[in-house]
Amino acid sequence: MPRHCSAAGCCTRDTRETRNRGISFHRLPKKDNPRRGLWLANCQRLDPSGQGLWDPASEYIYFCSKHFEEDCFELVGISGYHRLKEGAVPTIFESFSKLRRTTKTKGHSYPPGPAEVSRLRRCRKRCSEGRGPTTPFSPPPPADVTCFPVEEASAPATLPASPAGRLEPGLSSPFSDLLGPLGAQADEAGCSAQPSPERQPSPLEPRPVSPSAYMLRLPPPAGAYIQNEHSYQVGSALLWKRRAEAALDALDKAQRQLQACKRREQRLRLRLTKLQQERAREKRAQADARQTLKEHVQDFAMQLSSSMA
């Protein structure tokens, strides 16, 4: 498993490219080390509940050298190896904290300020001069009001068919904090162009059920209940089970092939031994035949010499 930086918003991993760039990884001090609290406090990362500071249970938590200042390292040896000093603490986390605050600001809707309320009030007052008296404008509800109540989520067919149907200036709705800027632009457009008397507003027709209503009832993804302390996620358990079964089947097949190869090797060894024995017997028979022939030749030579004498 490759090492990676556990700081919020940092995606640096221990690869060949990062090592060539001179980026090193340093492990979080153990729980009995007083510097551990400083490291966790400076990284400004919250626990999964979002209440306190992040205190991981794993012993393999690393921070890359981009979060340390230059004076936190020292040169060691002739090769120029940069080693982290004993009392070094990571302090460079500003950019990642700003990024996290920006994403949080985008994800929540806050009530408009006094300047926006006064601008919307003046715009609605100019538009109401041509329509008649209206009820006084009320500011949008506070941010703690839920934007999507259960009644609207259970009956999506009652939503308007198009965003053209705007709310009245005096009415307050849970969607007013989301439709505030859009409603102001639509009111300005309505002030510039008066509606013709021939065009009558058509009754709202029920729209088809959006697929998002069914997406809310889908089960969570596999491994969603597992607490993630790292930037990677555990895959599907069913997928890993299938991979394990496929690996076991491949291992069983390889073992059967190995046993068959061993039996074939044993048969070949026995056949080779028999051939060697037959070859040795043939050599001994040839040697005996030569010796017998030599003896016969010597006897014939002796008989021939004795007969000539």
Swiss-Prot record:
InterPro entries with a match to the protein in the record: THAP7 (IPR026519), THAP_Znf (IPR006612)
Domain of life, per lineage: Eukaryota
Disulfide cross-links: none
Pfam families: THAP
Motif residue range(s): HCFC1-binding motif (HBM): 229-232
UniProt GO MF annotations: C2H2 zinc finger domain binding; DNA binding; general transcription initiation factor binding; histone deacetylase binding; histone H4 reader activity; histone reader activity; identical protein binding; transcription corepressor binding
Pro residues composition bias: residue spans: 198-209
Listed GO biological process terms: chromatin organization; negative regulation of DNA-templated transcription; negative regulation of transcription by RNA polymerase II; regulation of DNA-templated transcription
Record PTM Phosphoserine, positions in chain: 162, 210
Biological function: Chromatin-associated, histone tail-binding protein that represses transcription via recruitment of HDAC3 and nuclear hormone receptor corepressors.
Name under which the protein is recorded: THAP domain-containing protein 7
